[in-house]
Amino acid sequence: MARPDKAAAVAELTDQFRSSNAAVLTEYRGLTVAQLKELRRSLGENAQYAVVKNTLTKIAANEAGIDTLDDLFSGPTAVAFVTGDPVESAKGLRDFAKDNPNLIIKGGVLDGKALSADEIKKLADLESREVLLSKLAGAFKGKQTQAAQVFQALPSKFVRTAEALRAKKEEQGGAGTPAPAEAAE
């Protein structure tokens, strides 16, 4: 590869590292072209899977401020640059690796923090951001409904209690007090 081509490749990889919120490094030794196409499809729209040169990618990662991946650049390496939900991409990689043991997850980076292969697999076990947000919204809605019911119940309970006390006093007032004595003649 000519020097200007290398500089352009490093610049492109640097932009990909900077624009993605996660990058997962994998070893793809033994995968066919058809399997790589299938992997790219399984990652979806929010991830780009690229076979890369280790030296150029290492330089690009360092230029992007990511120096925690240096040990992972050995052997045939490909990077999944994730711009959307990292959980979905991690699930796609994990599931593909289960079906295709030649794909090995080496590690990665999420929002500037280095992740081991095990941490990426744990990330894949999480529910997606949308599911977690909907559960959170449901929990808030349930608490709001409970609070509304409590606030509605308090005035009606007060009215019923006051009505019961009034009825009790009327009963006691009518039966419990002596009748006025008739005037003695």
UniProtKB/Swiss-Prot annotation:
GO biological process: translation
HAMAP family, A to Z: Ribosomal_uL10 (MF_00362)
Protein name as catalogued: Large ribosomal subunit protein uL10
CDD domains associated with the record: Ribosomal_L10
Listed GO MF terms: large ribosomal subunit rRNA binding; structural constituent of ribosome
Subunit: Part of the ribosomal stalk of the 50S ribosomal subunit. The N-terminus interacts with L11 and the large rRNA to form the base of the stalk. The C-terminus forms an elongated spine to which L12 dimers bind in a sequential fashion forming a multimeric L10(L12)X complex.
Keywords assigned: Ribonucleoprotein, Ribosomal protein, RNA-binding, rRNA-binding
Naturally occurring in which organism (per UniProt): Streptomyces griseus subsp. griseus (strain JCM 4626 / CBS 651.72 / NBRC 13350 / KCC S-0626 / ISP 5235)
Record lineage: Bacteria, Bacillati, Actinomycetota, Actinomycetes, Kitasatosporales
Residues spanning the membrane: none
Pfam family, one: Ribosomal_L10
Record region (Disordered): 165-185
